[in-house]
Amino acid sequence: MSYEDAEYIREMAMKHSEMFGEGIALIASENVMSPLAKEVMISDLESRYAEGLPHHRYYQGNYYVDLIEDRTNELLSKLFRTSQTDPRPISGTNANSAAIYALAGPGDLVATPSLSGGGHISAAEFGILGMRSVRTINYPYDMDTMTIDPDQASKMIIKEKPKVCLFGQSVFMFPAPLKEMAEAFHEVGCKVWYDGAHVLGLIAGGRFQDPLREGADIVTGSTHKTFPGPQHGVILGNTDDETWKAVRRAVFPGVLSNHHLNAMAALGITAAEELEFGKRYADDIISNAKVLAEELYANGFNVLAEKRGFTESHTMAVDVSKNGGGKYVAETLEKCGIILNKNLLPWDDNKKSQNPSGIRIGVQEATRVGMGKSEMKEIASLITRAIIRHEDPEKIKAEVKQLKSGFREVKYCYGKMDGYSYIKLI
């Protein structure tokens, strides 16, 4: 049965590709890679190992790997305007692990966004911070503006004196108030760590905010959301040499050995493409997000942060508690071929994670395959018909498939490729 089992897995992978190729992906944490990035992902690099830094390896056979990593660092330095870059983390959470091991130890206090306020699970007491045995305290959150309250948070920092102030959210609609809180950071002498996983591509495109120039010592991130590369991680710095050395030691030998060389190379290619196409891509993402949010709001959905224009990023949050709840809405839309996720909102208890009040929507992948303002309006109409008018999911799914058929080619990159085709080798 072994071959049949292998064929079964292959068939399921092909069906998975077909599902996304025929559907509209609005998950805020996903994207599709460019042809060149995907090409190096299946190169011989995927089979090889490298430990340590370029030209100081523990393995032979790394001559070309070193050249690739050198160039990747150069591209990241140019893109983010810093000499401190590390492309080795194998995911955003892996990068976060290295950061917390470098910046804080057991018993230290770290200020973080709350989970229901959009914070990432790695920054929760049951995530990496808890595993490091640090103490956490959450910033006061302004539900009207859907961001940290800078005045109250500054007072908290001065009173509690955390060793590290962590910013960054998985529902990241507006810039973190780094500049507004700079005086508090300086008064207590804390390190400022910015988790830019969701908005890294917007930052690369010169949009949203510039954390390294606004006071962040360290920026961590994954490289497959608004930054449209492989599932990998990166760390950027604007800090003292001692702290940067601690970060690099935490990466290796701290939280990884080999750093997935194919993904590192794909990251470098994506950085090169971002230097050429990133500004336009970031502009189009934000423009599309605003249009979709406005249309959903006009159609009767409770899209949050209406007074602030709904969003300044790729993401919007929608309170669907009166539409059946996050679980029902996400599952219903999946039946229609529209893929997004349920999400906690600031007033939700963490215990409601399986059926929260909200949904989270991201437009970076739809934008990546060429969708624009008119398609955003059409998507809003399809969502409205499914959730508010309760139309037949199969009917809507057929219309989704028809719409998506014209938007499969990856844009904002070198070359042309169907982003959803399954690559058969045998």
From Swiss-Prot:
> What highest taxon heads this organism's lineage?
Archaea
Q: Name one GO molecular function term.
A: pyridoxal phosphate binding
Annotated CDD domains: SHMT
GO process annotations (BP)? glycine biosynthetic process from serine; tetrahydrofolate interconversion
Q: Spell out the residues of the site Plays an important role in substrate specificity.
A: 224
| Keyword field | Amino-acid biosynthesis, Cytoplasm, One-carbon metabolism, Pyridoxal phosphate, Transferase
Q: Which pathway does the UniProt entry assign to this protein?
A: Amino-acid biosynthesis; glycine biosynthesis; glycine from L-serine: step 1/1
Where on this chain does (6S)-5,6,7,8-tetrahydrofolate bind? 115, 119-121
Asked if the record carries the keyword Transport, the reply is no
* Modified-residue entries (N6-(pyridoxal phosphate)lysine), positions: 225
Name the needed cofactors: pyridoxal 5'-phosphate
Principal place of residence: cytoplasm
Please name the top-level EC class of this enzyme: transferase
Report one GO cellular component. cytoplasm
Q: How does it assemble?
A: Homodimer.
Query: What is the protein's known function?
Result: Catalyzes the reversible interconversion of serine and glycine with a modified folate serving as the one-carbon carrier. Also exhibits a pteridine-independent aldolase activity toward beta-hydroxyamino acids, producing glycine and aldehydes, via a retro-aldol mechanism.
Family indicated by similarity: Belongs to the SHMT family.
The protein's name is: Serine hydroxymethyltransferase
What is the originating organism of this protein? Thermoplasma acidophilum (strain ATCC 25905 / DSM 1728 / JCM 9062 / NBRC 15155 / AMRC-C165)
Q: Which gene encodes it?
A: glyA
